[in-house]
Amino acid sequence: MRQTYSFKKDFAGKTLKIDIGKVAWQATGAALVQYGETTVLVTVVASEEKKEDVDFFPLTVEYVERLYAAGKIPGGFFKREGKPTEPEILFARLIDRPLRPLFSKDFRNEVQVIVTVLSYDHENSTDIPSIIGASCAIMLAGLPFKGPIGAVRVGWDGKEWYINPSVALSNSLLLDLVVAGTKDAVLMIEGDGKEVPEEIFLEGIIRAHEQIGEVINFQEEILSMVNPVPFNYEPFVVNENLKKDVLEYVTVDQIRDAIFTPSKSERQKALEDLKKRVIEHFKPIYGEITAQIDEIINQEAKAILTKVILEEKRRVDGRRLNELRPVSCEVGVLSRVHGSALFQRGETQVLSVVTLGAGEEQIIESVIESEPKRYIHHYNFPPFSVGEAKPLRGPKRREIGHGALAERALLPLIPKEEEFPYTIRVVSEVLSSNGSTSMASVCGSSLSLMDAGVPIKTHVAGVAMGLIKEGEKFEVLTDIQGLEDALGGMDFKIAGTKNGITAVQLDIKVDGLSYEIIEKTLKQAKEARYQILDIMEKTISQPRPEISPYAPRIMVLEINPNKIGDLIGPSGKNIKKIIEETHTTINIKPEGLVYISAPDQESAEKAAQMVQEYTRDIKEGDIFLGKVIRVTDYGAFVEILPGKIGLLHISKYKTTGTGKNQTREEINLGDEILIKVDSIDPSGRISLSRKDL
């Protein structure tokens, strides 16, 4: 009989329940986590053998939503879940970030964490129980992990603070943050704000971290009861004799000269040539040593970089610690597109292109409800941007993650549909990469949106901040490039306007960040952001007054919702007629808003006129130019508006003369005649008259 455990705790006013040993017996570790009525199963499987010849920890995190969790049946022909959706990829990346830095550096066994969403209560998001469950499952597996960790969502509405707010409330808050960490330090931050000041952001991080200790204590209680067996693994250890021989064969000055080469491509070549020379020299003696040499050279390069930055306050390209690389901007770089911009920062170069469309919102299929997306940002990272030749096989997880981050950074500035009724797609093409491409795409997006005439009130800029740390000594680096990201301790991406922060994302390689480091980073990033925004404003300071002549024209009309049926007509007859005659696309909202998208202004105006005719209220005394569509013995039926027909009784015909000489006018099929609405009965039947006209 298997031993099962069930633990409960009140956490931010809701019940957090973790079941151990109930399901997934074959996994190395598993936890069934329920928060409110949202339930996730988190499993961890570790391979028994270490992965040879890799210089990284092979961790994979998968997040899988089963739509039955929210009582939904998947769309599409096959009616089953397929490849990971964008929300699933973003959640997987969110869960991965606080876990990865806490695994032992000598652990090279493959580890797969799978989070499966089993139940969703439409109130509690799945991210917080997923991170807590992943921490618990890893600890139960006995893996070499410096946990447990906790995670909390914190929100602010301008007055009140909320811990683990509901999904609906989170969507309406000025600040929405997910923070993960240990008892002593912060490991991961991800969130967005509506131009929130740095001080409020920091307060939110601190408030969240104060709650994390509760969750960690709860997990420690679970671990003390379950008492997991430590995972037995063969550690990755650098051969000390090889290390001694390498550092005698290669001098510190040679490594230093390689990493302090100004150009990225030249620096990479210098380091690769150095490693290649060392491998060729020692391979006959030690055998396959590629991973070992990578580790030795990288650790030595990191030590040199750390020493120079902490002691000399100097970076590999000669910049000061808080200095930006040279920034340049250009807008209107492509002629036929709706908006474009080229943003360059050092050797990082991004082309952002805007396309305006009508009624083409993106619908996301997920257990968590979301509004159709009117603003979409896609980020492409082709291999040529880093001087590589690789096959193109669609966007990778990193590209999806970076695209979503830049999207969130601009979203608070995107005008409401009532103000600007277009669907907006921005594509950022990375043309050259030397670090901080996601933040460059934020800047490029902002510039291209203004170039396209999208009425955003101000620019948004982003900057990536780095960290060099040794013991208690640390320095924060502004606008990190590739090497400083690879060898440094953090990549803290911060985007915003001059009014405040709109999006953040923190990745770290150290064991956590103190409040002091976070505060210094936010302050330094603000200074850099202001400098970038000043440069962007000199290029284009406000949106162009007109959209591109190549963009579709959209008109918005408001009609009485009760008239929607009149506009559509029987079997869609009326709306089809408008679309066919004007070559437009028409989208009708239930509240009575009619969106007309046309290739040119003339077509849009013609369609608008027809919509108004179909939905116009007819009143007694109104005069129309109508068309006779049927003639009978007792009168004529006249169409006064599309689909609106009245009876002109013979007694209401126009007459001439008097007495015996009085004659009634002759009306024939197809005649166009001026006519007046005489009366409308309670059932809506219209009586017409030609008298007195």
UniProtKB/Swiss-Prot annotation:
Record-level GO BP terms: mRNA catabolic process; RNA catabolic process; RNA processing
Enzyme class: transferase
UniProt-recorded Gene Ontology molecular function terms: 3'-5'-RNA exonuclease activity; magnesium ion binding; polyribonucleotide nucleotidyltransferase activity; RNA binding
Main location: cytoplasm
Entry keyword annotation includes Iron: no
Localization in the cell: Cytoplasm
SUPFAM superfamilies tied to this protein: Eukaryotic type KH-domain (KH-domain type I), Nucleic acid-binding proteins, Polynucleotide phosphorylase/guanosine pentaphosphate synthase (PNPase/GPSI), domain 3, Ribonuclease PH domain 2-like, Ribosomal protein S5 domain 2-like
Swiss-Prot/TrEMBL keywords: Cytoplasm, Magnesium, Metal-binding, Nucleotidyltransferase, RNA-binding, Transferase
GO cellular component, one term: cytosol
E.C. numbers: 2.7.7.8
KH domain span: 552-611
Cofactor(s) demanded: Mg(2+)
Reactions performed catalytically: RNA(n+1) + phosphate = RNA(n) + a ribonucleoside 5'-diphosphate
Residues that, per the record, bind Mg(2+): 485, 491
InterPro entries per record: ExoRNase_PH_dom1, ExoRNase_PH_dom2, ExoRNase_PH_dom2_sf, KH_dom, KH_dom_type_1, KH_dom_type_1_sf, NA-bd_OB-fold, PNPase
Domain S1 motif: 621-691
UniProt-listed HAMAP family: PNPase
Family: Belongs to the polyribonucleotide nucleotidyltransferase family.
Function in brief: Involved in mRNA degradation. Catalyzes the phosphorolysis of single-stranded polyribonucleotides processively in the 3'- to 5'-direction.
The protein's name in its UniProt record: Polyribonucleotide nucleotidyltransferase
